[in-house]
């Protein structure tokens, strides 16, 4: 409380003070003062609680000058130790693991990796789901350690760059269209079978088709006819013995039949030719073919 008194004094003159003195009170009193103190006390309590929560959060989250917990900030980017769970999409230029450990990506639903262009459109996608792995791109390629293409797929063709393509399934390999390859070979001590259940099987090559069995036999079975046709060359059966075990045996017919009969003749070099049959052999008469 402040009191102000106005008194005029002159040297040598005494002036009596007035009986009524005016007192002016400046400040906050009563319930307003109590509310102000209560508000200040509440601010102090909130400040202390905030400071305590800040210290607790810093301690729980493992904040340090290098980063937060297992997440460290380096000059090359962010380094994350241990296992982490991302609840929202992760955008990064490069993700790699430590030198002494592998990189593991897992999810309860699927793992999707997208590549986008400058306009935000998806240009490539790799989706690993519970039932299949889906790749969406113009070309899919697998390379070896030295950069050699091992497997390439695009809209036009599938290229296998390995030295050998091995199919181990019990049903083999099923091709709906043509297959182009320089060699078809079975595993050692296993049979090689080429089959077309409902259509024909064709093997074409501009410089010849070579079929060889080193330790077994080659068998061709057909319900209908088996035809060997050579337009410009000849058919060669190169073997010590040529057997035709199921040839139909002829029967005696009426004499003087007009039906033309021929006999098979063999040249010294193995060439076969037909000769008109007679009472005796006529091969000698047509042996000019062997010359």
UniProtKB/Swiss-Prot annotation:
Entry superkingdom: Eukaryota
Disease implicated: Muscular dystrophy, limb-girdle, autosomal recessive 5: An autosomal recessive degenerative myopathy characterized by rapidly progressive muscle wasting from early childhood with loss of independent ambulation around age 12 years, dystrophic pattern on muscle biopsy, absence of gamma-sarcoglycan and normal dystrophin immunostaining.
Location(s) in or outside the cell: Cell membrane, Sarcolemma; Cytoplasm, Cytoskeleton
GO cellular component: cytoskeleton; endoplasmic reticulum membrane; plasma membrane; sarcoglycan complex; sarcolemma
Tissues of expression: Expressed in skeletal and heart muscle.
Protein name: Gamma-sarcoglycan
Topology, Cytoplasmic side: 1-37
Membrane association type: Single-pass type II membrane protein
Protein family membership: Belongs to the sarcoglycan beta/delta/gamma/zeta family.
InterPro entries registered for this protein in UniProt: Sarcoglycan, Sarcoglycan_gamma/delta/zeta
TM annotation in the entry: 38-58
GO biological process terms held by the UniProt record: cardiac muscle tissue development; gene expression; heart contraction; muscle organ development
Principal subcellular localization: membrane
Subunit annotation: Interacts with the syntrophin SNTA1. Cross-link to form 2 major subcomplexes: one consisting of SGCB, SGCD and SGCG and the other consisting of SGCB and SGCD. The association between SGCB and SGCG is particularly strong while SGCA is loosely associated with the other sarcoglycans. Interacts with FLNC.
Extracellular topological intervals: 59-291
Cystine pairs: 265-290, 267-283
Sites where a glycan is attached: 110
Source organism (scientific name): Homo sapiens (Human)
Keyword terms of this UniProt record: Cell membrane, Cytoplasm, Cytoskeleton, Disease variant, Disulfide bond, Glycoprotein, Limb-girdle muscular dystrophy, Membrane, Signal-anchor, Transmembrane, Transmembrane helix
Keyword Cell membrane: yes
Pfam families reported in the protein's UniProt record: Sarcoglycan_1
Function field: Component of the sarcoglycan complex, a subcomplex of the dystrophin-glycoprotein complex which forms a link between the F-actin cytoskeleton and the extracellular matrix.
